[in-house]
Amino acid sequence: STKAYSTQLAVIYMIVLYMAEQLHNISEQELQAYIEELQRLPEFVAACLTDKETIQYFASKYFNAKDMYFIGRNVDYAASLEASLKLKEISYIHSEAYTAGELKHGPISLIEDGTLVIAICTYDKLFDKMMSNVKEVKARGAVVLGITTQQKKEAVSQEADYSFCVPKISDFMLPSLSIIPLQLFA
């Protein structure tokens, strides 16, 4: 369920922060900033829901799709896995999640004209590589929905057919937000 997934992520974040503190891998100031961000997650989730019409439009347009693929890198790949599972469970649509860096090793051959690909592009460090993957699937005829942060919206909008923005928070916490529009979509 959505609540279980979100709760699991929050607990993982707390464990990671605790371990980082215990191992002295994080300053007190950084720790407090992460804790404040974690406490504000409900506010950030609410911000994701203000533009749910975009996702509802996309869902209504492609509700009878036969196949759908989710791609992402690093933490975005983890969100892709959860989104694919949700789509299968709720909509009974065949979907798969792939790490975008592995597309050339087989999965790209599944993409044909009109195939739906949801690209989660929130992780800053691998953003340029992710955009390269979006171009690859577009070249094969995919229809792409890009999930990104407001800071990257323009770049994603230039490549994807549709885009949806989530608030920018720490990279490792972004799956808590990028999953929201995808759960609405499912």
Regions found by a protein language model. Give the residues of each.
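A SIS-like phosphosugar-recognition module
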Residues: 1-186
